[in-house]
Amino acid sequence: MSKVYDWFEERLEIQSIADDITSKYVPPHVNIFYCLGGITFTCFLVQVATGFAMTFYYRPTVAEAFASVQYIMTEVNFGWLIRSIHRWSASMMVLMMILHVFRVYLTGGFKKPRESTWISGVIMAVCTVSFGVTGYSLPWDQIGYWAVKIVTGVPEAIPVVGGPLVELLRGGVGVGQATLTRFYSLHTFVLPLLTAVFMLAHFLMIRKQGISGPL
């Protein structure tokens, strides 16, 4: 085992990277509330893992979506547990994200020179809410259907561009298969990719600038 480690160490200098990570200075004012962002990140990882597991059985069609969710809950081994963890972790992620935003705002973590970190965090907050909106529709039950119909109908009040924007979201005039396909694509590919990119940028900026000082 040591030979394998030495092989990687010689080429990648793993030890120096580990030393840099573990020796990072942590200010004395940091408390448990500074862990809220990390908890949100953990919830995101749980969402990715459980969501990926469900994609093996979920069918994004208006005719089969609801039945496939029922199949996951009743027939797939531990499917009920995986979907329940996905749902609970989603609620926890939203809650921790909100608390994290409040903590950063109340402690002034958005001020110079951390404006970019704050902006990337706000974008991720929007992505998190969008996860909830798109994921809510995927079972394609009565609640999901009418939620999509209401949410996608909101932009219609915008002058000039409202109508085309609604059609873009729905994939047509009414809510149907094209809408479900769009929401499934957003929920399983577009939003996770955007969130991962902005998370990486967020962490790199925190790493570079350090944790903000006390008020």
UniProtKB/Swiss-Prot annotation:
The chain crosses the membrane at residues 32-52, 90-110, 116-136, 186-206. Keywords: Chloroplast, Electron transport, Heme, Iron, Membrane, Metal-binding, Photosynthesis, Plastid, Thylakoid, Transmembrane, Transmembrane helix, Transport. One of its GO terms (cellular component) is chloroplast thylakoid membrane. Its cofactor is heme b; heme c. The keyword Protease does not apply. It is found in: Plastid, Chloroplast thylakoid membrane. Heme c binds at residue 35. Binds 2 heme b groups non-covalently with two histidine residues as axial ligands. Binds one heme group covalently by a single cysteine link with no axial amino acid ligand. This heme was named heme ci. Heme b 1 binds at residues 100, 202. GO terms for molecular function: electron transporter, transferring electrons within cytochrome b6/f complex of photosystem II activity; metal ion binding; oxidoreductase activity. GO terms for biological process: photosynthesis; respiratory electron transport chain. InterPro entries: Cyt_b/b6_N, Cyt_B6_PetB, Cytb/b6-like_sf, Cytochrome_b_N_euk/bac, Di-haem_cyt_TM. Pfam families: Cytochrome_B. Heme b 2 binds at residues 86, 187. The keyword Metal-binding applies. It is a multi-pass membrane protein. Component of the cytochrome b6-f complex, which mediates electron transfer between photosystem II (PSII) and photosystem I (PSI), cyclic electron flow around PSI, and state transitions. Heme 1 (or BH or b566) is high-potential and absorbs at about 566 nm, and heme 2 (or BL or b562) is low-potential and absorbs at about 562 nm. Belongs to the cytochrome b family. PetB subfamily. The 4 large subunits of the cytochrome b6-f complex are cytochrome b6, subunit IV (17 kDa polypeptide, PetD), cytochrome f and the Rieske protein, while the 4 small subunits are PetG, PetL, PetM and PetN. The complex functions as a dimer. This is Cytochrome b6. It comes from Tetradesmus obliquus (Green alga). The lineage of its organism: Eukaryota, Viridiplantae, Chlorophyta, core chlorophytes, Chlorophyceae.
